[in-house]
Structure formats: C-alpha cells, structure tokens
C-alpha cells in the first residue's frame, strides 16, 4: 500500500507546487509518475487524500485492459437546440485525471489570450476584452476536443516545459493514453480527448498555444483584439476588417495549419447597433448578462415569496430541471441553482451592484441567513459589522444546529446587543 512518511508529508506541505516542478523534471519511471500523482493528491485534498497504487495507473493507461470500464456517456441539451454528447470518466479515472490536470496547470502557463479553464480567467475576463467595439466577430471550432488525438497529446508532452523526450518518450505516450479514449467519430474509431475528462480543457490550451500565438499576431496586424475560450474564438475591432479577404484567408489558413476546422454555421459578425455577445455575455458598452437571466432569478424568488417553499420547489423541478435535463435530483436543487446563479451574477456585475444586492437579500430572506457567517464576522470584525450584515436580510429566525442536533434561535436582539 502506497504511503508517505511524516517527513515526506511535511516536505509536500512546505514546498507544494515547487515539489511538483522538481519531481517532474526528474521523471524517469512509472513509479515516479505515481509519486507525483500522489503528491498532487495530497496538495489537493490534504488529510482526506486517498493515495493511488501503481496498478491503478497501469490499468487506466492501457486501453486493452480498461476500454469498457473507463467512461460512461450521457447527453445534455444545447442552448441552440439538439444535444451534446459528454463522455465522463469513472470515479477512479476521474481522480487520476484531476491530479494530472493539477500537475499540468502547475507546469504550463497558457497563452495570455486563452481565457477558458485557466486560473483567474473566466467568461467575464474574456468578454471584457471586447466591450464597446464597433464590430465583434465570433467563430467556432468544429468537433474541438475530438480534433486532438493521442499522438498529438504525446507530442505536446515531449515539448517544453514537459520535456518527456528521448529515453522518457514512453512516459509521454503512457500519460497521453491516460488522457485519451477510443471514440467513434464520424463513422471511424479514433483515440482522442473526451469531452468530459478533467484534463481535456487544459490539454487543449497546451495544444492550442501555437494557434493562440498566430491568431493574436493576426489580430495585432489588423488592429483587432483576439481571445479564445475553448472552441469559441472572438475578434473585435472598431475598424471594418471582417470582410477583408486578406484577413479572412489568413485566418482560415492559420486554423487549417493547426489541423482544426472552422464551423461555418456558427460564424457571426455582430455590429454595434445590434446586441453583441461574447461567451454568453453582452458586451455592447460593458459586460452584462441577458435581461432574461435576472428576470428568471426574480421569478423564482417571487414564487417562493408568494407560494411558499414547497410549491415553489415543485414548480422549479417541473420547469427548470426538465429544461436542463442533466441537473441531479438533489434534496434542494432550487437553492443550489439560485445560489450558483447569484454567484455568477456577482462575478459579472460586481459585489456592489444594486441589482445583485437586492436579489441576494431576497434569497437570504427566503432560505434563512447563514448564522455561521454572522458569527464569524462578529468574531473577526466586531458586532457592528455583524449587525449590518444581519439587517440586510432580516430573517425571521436564525437557526444554528450543533452536533447533538439541538438548535439555537437567535433574535434580532441577540445579534444587536
């Protein structure tokens, strides 16, 4: 059974990501890969980490052994209609890939204009690059994840900063095999990146670095701004360059040179006088959500306020979950979905935005306030800050459950005196 000594755990805690860099530089065997995966596991999960065994890596990296056991398939609805097929790894493989994904992100810095699945970048930072422009030009890359085969992934791992070349080339192939899967693509079987594997987005950022560099150079040449969020590429400019034959031909040439294909059906030129959208956000003047997004939040909060939680939850399950299809049948899905939508709204509009603040106050009234949050602020920032936070929501009762199952009901007087 694989274990770390107390001294080794202390070293992992002290060095963290630096230890991953050190260990990857000297990677020479499958046992070395196992060690670095387990280091990542400890960094990610601490005391809860369950260390991998070499047999796990060998099994899941060998398609002959594990092809039928690696992935399960499901579909999700697209906003534009139709369905998207997702190939998701089984739990054991998912754990391995999450650790390798962390390792890849430690070792590799994506291009500055790669905005998807990168720490401290998001759909918001992507959209911000294209605000208040006369023209916004969107293109989509066809069958994006499935365009990257195992050999291409192996090649990338042989380059800087991974350098698994020469005598270490078999390790590059082994890791590439771990991250790819045999899928039927347009009538033929190919070993490619699955859409649903934790490593696939990061690996596409690695593999698309030359594409990002060339397209960013093209944008600069024509006085435009470029960015890419996964398969969604955006150019924006105040000049009318997007009907320029030289620009369009060079764009197509660069994409084809990287063995990728533009999905012509999804190419859009958006002018200032009409609504301009980038990665699901409006960018005409500033980054904003669709009106429908806020309208839907208000609707569900209104249902809670008017009909009560039980009926509102029933309406939510009937309509929203039916629409999305892939949402899990959780104990309280409405609360989780509304929380997620509010966090997204906060990310887009900012924590001080009036619309966000009003909606979050209604949410707190509807679901009850987080007593632990108040008490933490009370301890760290004083009673006045805690009272101010409480007064924004004004729930009827504040309930905190202890380990024995008993609860304490705090009134407004308890908090403010």
Task: Describe the role of every protein-language-model region.
Residues 80:
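ATP-binding glycine-rich loop module of kinase domains
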